[in-house]
């Protein structure tokens, strides 16, 4: 968060820490922008930390075929279309810097990231169908028909994702255990 000024830090705190604000922003987003249902041909990447999920994410994102949230969608990741009307990326948003994990991976404000976890933290299993609305809103935002997401926490949601999107692919990379453990120690 040291890359943000006082206003940006407080906006992030407000937008991401209050369930009421997250739910309200999602409700407004649906009212204003939810128009289409997109085909079920998405890709979900999940796995243990340092297993290669970020590398796969970046490779797929570079194809330009998929819609996915990026750092520029922060902090209103549950209202990406509405936020895009307010926040216009600057040229400097494409500048790369080391991500906050300090693991050597370079990102920009236009890089994809696992922001769908905000959805899962906001809504419980009774609202699981809302995830389809969320994915459709992201696809509308990026004018794509295929969604992809890397989220290591989805390892516990494989059944849910499979039920929601039976035609989608779930990629689970595996890494040699000693290499993975060594990577986690760094």
Predicted regions and their residues:
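A short, well-structured juxtamembrane/interface segment
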Residues: 26-33, 127-140, 154-157
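Short catalytic/ligand-binding loop motif for oxyanion handling, primarily in non-cytosolic enzymes
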Residues: 52-54, 75-79, 156-157, 178-183
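A conserved segment at the C-terminal end of the G1
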Residues: 54-67
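P-loop (Walker A) phosphate-binding loop of NTP-binding proteins
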Residues: 48
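Hydrophobic anchor at the beta1->P-loop junction of P-loop NTPases
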Residues: 45
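PAPS-dependent sulfation machinery
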Residues: 72-148
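Conserved phosphate-donor/acceptor-positioning beta-strand/loop module used by diverse small-molecule
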Residues: 150-152, 161-186
């Amino acid at each position: 968060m040291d890359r943000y000024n006082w206003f940006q830090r407080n906006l992030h705190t407000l937008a991401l820490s209050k369930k009421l604000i997250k739910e309200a922003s999602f409700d407004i987003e649906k009212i204003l922008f939810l128009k289409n249902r997109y085909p079920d041909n998405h890709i979900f990447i999940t796995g243990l930390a340092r297993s290669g999920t970020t590398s796969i994410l970046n490779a797929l994102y570079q194809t330009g075929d998929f819609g996915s949230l990026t750092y520029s969608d922060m902090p209103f990741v549950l209202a990406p279309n509405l936020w895009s009307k307010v926040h216009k990326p600057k040229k400097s948003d494409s500048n790369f810097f080391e991500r906050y994990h300090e693991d050597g991976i370079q990102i920009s404000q236009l890089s994809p990231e696992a922001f769908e976890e905000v959805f899962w933290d906001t809504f419980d299993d009774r609202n699981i169908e809302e995830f389809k609305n969320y994915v459709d809103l992201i696809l509308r935002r990026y004018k794509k028909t295929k969604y992809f997401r890397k989220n290591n926490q989805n390892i516990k949601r494989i059944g849910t994702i499979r039920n929601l999107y039976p035609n989608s692919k779930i990629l689970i990379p595996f890494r040699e255990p000693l290499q993975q453990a060594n990577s986690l120690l760094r």
